[in-house]
């Protein structure tokens, strides 16, 4: 998703 969190 955001790039700086471990999510797409």
Curated annotation (Swiss-Prot):
UniProtKB keywords: Toxin
Covalent crosslink: Cyclopeptide (Met-Pro): 1-8
PTM remark: Processed by the macrocyclase-peptidase enzyme POPB to yield a cyclic octapeptide. POPB first removes 10 residues from the N-terminus. Conformational trapping of the remaining peptide forces the enzyme to release this intermediate rather than proceed to macrocyclization. The enzyme rebinds the remaining peptide in a different conformation and catalyzes macrocyclization of the N-terminal 8 residues.
One MF annotation (Gene Ontology) recorded for this entry: toxin activity
Disulfide bonds: none
Function: Cyclic octapeptide that belongs to the MSDIN-like toxin family responsible for a large number of food poisoning cases and deaths. Cycloaminide B is non-toxic to mammals but shows immunosuppressive activity, probably through the inhibition of the action of interleukin-1 and interleukin-2.
Family: Belongs to the MSDIN fungal toxin family.
Protein name: Cycloamanide D
Organism of provenance: Amanita phalloides (Death cap)
């Amino acid at each position: 998703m955001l790039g700086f969190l471990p999510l797409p």
